[in-house]
């Protein structure tokens, strides 16, 4: 059985993937985080995002179709061998207080 389809990229991520190289070329000393930050600034300033929003909508429709096909073929129904997010116990959950935990006597001195 095929793997579950990956979620589609947002309009911003589609745009950033296409603009990343030009941002790097203009700012060769930028780190990955700085490229993303600059990309965010440029995206906010972008007047016409319709091209990227249309591409994102198409990608979302393709994802929905692929996901339905995946589920029709029996994917996603059973979680055998897969851990769910949030299934791990929270840090400190189930721990008992150390106060008096190692004490063998009940306070009686005989």
UniProtKB/Swiss-Prot annotation:
One Gene Ontology term, aspect cellular component: chromosome
Q: Which SUPFAM superfamilies match?
A: HMG-box
Q: Which GO terms describe its biological process?
A: regulation of transcription by RNA polymerase II
Please name the InterPro entries in this protein's record. Answer: HMG_box_dom, HMG_box_dom_sf, HMGB
Q: Which CDD domains match?
A: HMG-box_SSRP1-like
Annotated Gene3D superfamilies: High mobility group box domain
Query: Where does the UniProt annotation locate this protein?
Result: Nucleus; Chromosome
UniProt keyword Cell division present: no
Intrachain disulfide bonds: none
Which keywords annotate this record? Answer: Chromosome, DNA-binding, Nucleus
What GO molecular-function term can you cite, just one? DNA binding
**Residue spans with biased composition (Basic and acidic residues)?**
71-81
Residue ranges flagged as DNA-binding region: 5-71
The segments labelled Disordered in the record are 71-110
Role, per record: Found in condensed chromomeres. Binds preferentially to AT-rich DNA.
Descriptive protein name:
Mobility group protein 1B
Q: Which organism is it from?
A: Chironomus tentans
